[in-house]
Amino acid sequence: MKKLLIASLLVAASTLAHAAGESITVYKDPNCGCCSAWIEHLREAGYKVKPVDSGDMAAVKKRLGVPESLESCHTGVVDGSGQVVEGHVPATALAKLIAAPAVKGVAVPGMPSNSPGMGKMNGKLVTVDFAGKQFSKD
């Protein structure tokens, strides 16, 4: 059991280390404060973030293929892979996404109070893939 725990921790650390330094472009409404807080969360986790203000987020989401049922306030694109990140996705889930190139995108629909940029995480935040299936729980 101890070996399994150590192996799991090593995999998690490796995944996060791989993600550190990745670049992500974040499209957001210029008047959104929670978007800026989420960007800061990513920067604190080691991501390079390029914010892009947009007055037409609906068009951005449509162009990037974000399912309407999963929409939130901001949309990110991992620059190296083109993977899409919708809403207040935790940096840990973003690292898992980058390590899974077959996954097109992930989302935290809406604006949950227990998500980065909105409030304190409590271990119950669910990130889903674009098919709506659970991808991560943080």
Where do the PLM segments sit?
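Hydrophobic h-region of N-terminal signal peptides that target proteins for export
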Residues: L10-A19
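Soluble non-cytosolic domains of exported or imported proteins
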Residues: D29-S36, P51-G55, H88
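Conserved helix-turn-beta segment immediately C-terminal to the redox Cys motif
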Residues: I39-A58
